Amino acid sequence: MKNTVKLEQFVALKEKDLQKIKGGEMRISRIILDFLFLRKK
Protein backbone atom coordinates (compact mmCIF):
# COMPACT_ATOMS: atom_id res chain seq x y z
CA MET A 1 0.00 0.00 0.00
CA LYS A 2 2.88 2.36 0.72
CA ASN A 3 4.10 1.93 -2.85
CA THR A 4 0.67 2.92 -4.15
CA VAL A 5 0.73 6.14 -2.12
CA LYS A 6 4.22 6.97 -3.38
CA LEU A 7 3.08 6.33 -6.96
CA GLU A 8 0.11 8.68 -6.52
CA GLN A 9 2.36 11.38 -5.07
CA PHE A 10 4.83 10.87 -7.94
CA VAL A 11 2.04 11.13 -10.50
CA ALA A 12 0.73 14.29 -8.84
CA LEU A 13 4.20 15.84 -9.08
CA LYS A 14 4.50 14.79 -12.72
CA GLU A 15 1.11 16.35 -13.50
CA LYS A 16 2.40 19.66 -12.08
CA ASP A 17 5.50 19.32 -14.25
CA LEU A 18 3.32 18.65 -17.29
CA GLN A 19 1.42 21.88 -16.67
CA LYS A 20 4.69 23.86 -16.48
CA ILE A 21 6.73 22.13 -19.17
CA LYS A 22 5.65 21.96 -22.81
CA GLY A 23 7.62 20.28 -25.59
CA GLY A 24 10.02 17.32 -25.65
CA GLU A 25 10.29 16.93 -21.88
CA MET A 26 6.51 16.85 -21.61
CA ARG A 27 6.35 13.94 -24.05
CA ILE A 28 8.91 12.00 -22.02
CA SER A 29 6.93 12.63 -18.81
CA ARG A 30 3.78 11.49 -20.62
CA ILE A 31 5.45 8.20 -21.54
CA ILE A 32 6.51 7.70 -17.91
CA LEU A 33 2.96 8.42 -16.71
CA ASP A 34 1.48 5.99 -19.24
CA PHE A 35 3.96 3.33 -18.09
CA LEU A 36 3.03 3.90 -14.43
CA PHE A 37 -0.69 3.70 -15.16
CA LEU A 38 -0.18 0.46 -17.07
CA ARG A 39 1.71 -1.05 -14.13
CA LYS A 40 -0.94 0.17 -11.68
CA LYS A 41 -3.62 -1.86 -13.48
Swiss-Prot record:
It comes from the Bacteria. GO terms for cellular component: extracellular region. Pfam families: ComC. Keywords: Competence, Pheromone, Secreted. It is found in: Secreted. GO terms for biological process: establishment of competence for transformation. Its main location: secreted. Residues 1-24 form a propeptide. GO terms for molecular function: pheromone activity. The keyword Secreted applies. Acts as a pheromone, induces cells to develop competence for genetic transformation. Belongs to the ComC family. This is Competence-stimulating peptide type 2. It comes from Streptococcus pneumoniae serotype 4 (strain ATCC BAA-334 / TIGR4). The gene is comC2.
